[in-house]
Amino acid sequence: QRNLAAASRYEQVIEAFSRNDVNGGFRLADDLIQSFPSTAYADQANLAVARIQVENKQLDPAVARLRQVLASTKDAELALIVRLRLARVQLSQGKADDALKTLDAVTPGAFAARYAEVRGDVLLAKGDRDGALKAYREARSGDSTTIDTGLLDLKIGELARS
C-alpha cells in the first residue's frame, strides 16, 4: 500500500516536470521525499529534481540532492551512478579536486569505463593532458556498451594529436 502511494506520487512528479511545471514538480518531489523517505521513489524524486536543477544551472542545490541520494540509497548500483553525476556537477562548478575525490571514493565495478571517462574529463580540466589521455584510453578499453565510443575516440584523437 505504502509503495503504491509512493509510486503514484512519483508519477505526479514526473508528469509535472514533463509539463514544464518546475515549481509544481519541486513541491511534489519534496512532499514525496518527506512522506516516503528511504524509499527508491524518494531517491528517484531527488534525482529528477537534481536533473532539472543542473539544467537550470542551480548546481549547489543539485549537489545537495545528489548527496542526499548517496546518504539514503540502499542500491549500490544507483550509488555508483549518482557518484558519476555528482562528479560531473562538481566539475561544472570548477571543483575538479572534489570531483576526483568523489570518483576515487568507491570501486566502480561495472561502471569502470564511465568512471575512467569522467576522470579523464576532470584531469583535462586540471591541465593534466597525459593523465586525461591515459584515463580515456582506459575507458576505451573497458565495456563499450556503457560509454559513447565515438565521443571517447574524439577525445583520445584530440589529445593524441597535441
Name the predicted role of every residue range:
Residues 33-42, 71-79, 106-114, 141-150:
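Short solvent-exposed coil/turn linkers within tandem alpha-helical repeat scaffolds
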